[in-house]
A protein has these predicted regions:
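OB-fold and OB-like single-stranded nucleic-acid-recognition modules
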Residues: 1-232
Length: 232
């Protein structure tokens, strides 16, 4: 069985907005009084400024554990200090091009259970976590890729345990899809539950045809686009 599982994401576009903050570790931390950066970077990947993808940074210090300068620190500080412009603050014409090679991580939190009122359940919401930052694109002359569909992508090894077919909902403008459920591997050598949606007919047929279940899990690789969407 393979031990090096793939978990990669790629995001490039215009710097849309951010929630980055300078924080200081508490007295009970391993390194008290250490400054670090935390927050989200939002990147808009399409010309219509509709597909906004976030990348979360939980703990970035000026130096790495090996004592070397961490390039992420200077990049994030450039954003905080306004050296790098955002769509929200400065408009799309002045916004900086940004590229981040990240990975899928998870934000775990408790929320009220719909199935069991009065109780709470643990939710693992997937998100892009960390990664090195470049202020250019992978297109010609450092510009953004011409194909917008390649500007926010993911590739993951996955253990599929369920595939559910969902019909289209015309009233809510939702397409038919196959919901792929399973487990993915993160850099901490941990596994987390995850869902992906397949909307292309060939992809739907492939995943539904696997007949995956908890008793018959299927290990494979999935890849595709990251689309932000608002469901009404």
């Amino acid at each position: 069985m393979k031990t090096n599982f793939i978990n990669t994401t790629h995001i490039e576009g215009l710097l849309y907005d951010h929630t980055l903050e300078i924080k200081v570790t508490g007295e009970n931390s391993k390194h008290p009084g250490t400054q670090y950066l935390r927050g989200d970077i939002s990147v808009v990947t399409d010309s219509k400024l509709m597909n906004v993808v976030q990348v979360y940074y939980s703990y970035v210090t000026a130096t790495t554990s090996a004592g070397k300068a961490d390039s992420r620190w200077s990049s994030l500080m450039d954003i905080i200090n306004g050296k790098r412009k955002t769509v929200v603050a400065n408009g799309a014409d002045q916004a900086s091009i940004i590229r981040i090679d990240s990975a899928i991580g998870f934000n775990e939190f408790y929320t009220d259970s719909r199935e069991n009122p009065g109780t709470q359940e643990l939710v693992s919401a997937k998100r892009n976590e960390g990664g090195f930052i470049h202020f250019d694109g992978t297109g010609e002359n450092g510009l953004l890729l011409a194909d917008e569909h390649k500007r926010a992508t993911f590739k993951n090894d996955i253990v599929i345990t369920s595939v559910i077919e969902r019909e289209a909902n015309e009233e809510r403008n939702l397409p038919a899809k196959a919901i792929v459920k399973g487990w993915v591997f993160v850099f901490r050598k941990a596994i987390y539950p995850v869902e992906f949606s397949a909307i292309e007919p060939n992809a739907m047929n492939y995943f539904l045809g696997l007949e995956a279940s908890t008793k018959n899990p299927v290990i494979t690789q999935v890849w595709g686009e990251q689309d932000s969407e608002t469901t009404i």
